Amino acid sequence: MDTDSGDLSEGELSPGPEQFSSKSFAVQAQKKILSKMATKTMANMLIDDTSSEIFDELFKVTKEYVKNKKEAHKVLKDLVKVAVKVGILYRNKQFSLEELEIVENFRKKLNQTCMTAVSFFEVEYTFDKNVLSGLLHECKTLLHELVQRHLTPKSHSRIDRVFNHFADVEFLTALYSLEGNYRPYLKRICEGVNKLLDERVL
């Protein structure tokens, strides 16, 4: 899934025992199928509607901020790919007990990050770029740790690209500016995040 051609690259999952594992093969087969689909199709299949709407708003604000549609598309495509891959690993019970503890820690940190992001939007003059950036970087670290033995260096690079973009303090400052052009995007993003928080998805 790390290749645009759709071929299942060797090492997409970290090498395991020499013997054949039908479960591992099934995971790789799913990855191969998903790699041939468009990003939008993957999102529709494996990501709920509210998350898809949030991703769409993130794409719009990223495109406007970087002034480059291709670069914005790359960031969001990487975001969706990472989400899908982690979802596949989780669904197929690929995580060890120790890794499941990391999953729980990641969920808690992501929940804290989302609640903080929404609070900074809803309560004027509370926004702290360093706090939000720090939380996002903590999420990135936990995600790297979670998929360390499962995904390739290319996937880890995708994780870095996604989190480094959204945790960039200049981007966050522009996004949360009361006088800026990004306020409508932030409003819709926070509405979606609030919905996921209410539904206990996050």
UniProtKB/Swiss-Prot annotation:
Its main location: cytoplasm. Residues 1-10 have a biased composition (Acidic residues). Transmembrane segments: none annotated. InterPro entries: TNFAIP8-like (IPR008477), TNFAIP8_sf (IPR038355). The keyword Transport applies. Keywords: Cell membrane, Cytoplasm, Lipid transport, Membrane, Transport. GO terms for cellular component: cytoplasm; plasma membrane. GO terms for biological process: lipid transport; regulation of apoptotic process. Residues 1-24 are annotated as: Disordered. It is found in: Cytoplasm; Cell membrane. May act as a lipid transfer protein. Belongs to the TNFAIP8 family. This is Tumor necrosis factor alpha-induced protein 8-like protein 3. It comes from Xenopus laevis.
